[in-house]
Amino acid sequence: MAMRQCAIYGKGGIGKSTTTQNLVAALAEMNKKVMI
């Protein structure tokens, strides 16, 4: 399977870090390999 890239960006204080951590946690629970 090909690698997919997902970019989460925007101005400060909009929850980028929180969104990233929640997304990574959900993917890891589904036994997906993740790199941040």
UniProtKB/Swiss-Prot annotation:
Co-factor(s): [4Fe-4S] cluster
Cited InterPro entries: NifH/frxC, P-loop_NTPase
MF (Gene Ontology): 4 iron, 4 sulfur cluster binding; ATP binding; metal ion binding; nitrogenase activity
Gene Ontology terms describing biological process: nitrogen fixation
Catalytic activity of the protein: N2 + 8 reduced [2Fe-2S]-[ferredoxin] + 16 ATP + 16 H2O = H2 + 8 oxidized [2Fe-2S]-[ferredoxin] + 2 NH4(+) + 16 ADP + 16 phosphate + 6 H(+)
Source organism, top-level taxon: Bacteria
UniProt keyword annotations, A-Z: 4Fe-4S, ATP-binding, Iron, Iron-sulfur, Metal-binding, Nitrogen fixation, Nucleotide-binding, Oxidoreductase, Plasmid
Binding site for ATP: G10, K11, G12, G13, I14, G15, K16, S17
Stored Pfam families: Fer4_NifH
Cofactor-binding details, from the entry: Binds 1 [4Fe-4S] cluster per dimer.
Annotated EC: 1.18.6.1
Record has Phosphoprotein as a keyword: no
Job of this protein: The key enzymatic reactions in nitrogen fixation are catalyzed by the nitrogenase complex, which has 2 components: the iron protein and the molybdenum-iron protein.
Entry's family note: Belongs to the NifH/BchL/ChlL family.
Record's subunit section: Homodimer.
Name this polypeptide is given: Nitrogenase iron protein
Organism: Enterobacter agglomerans
Lineage per the UniProt record: Bacteria, Pseudomonadati, Pseudomonadota, Gammaproteobacteria, Enterobacterales
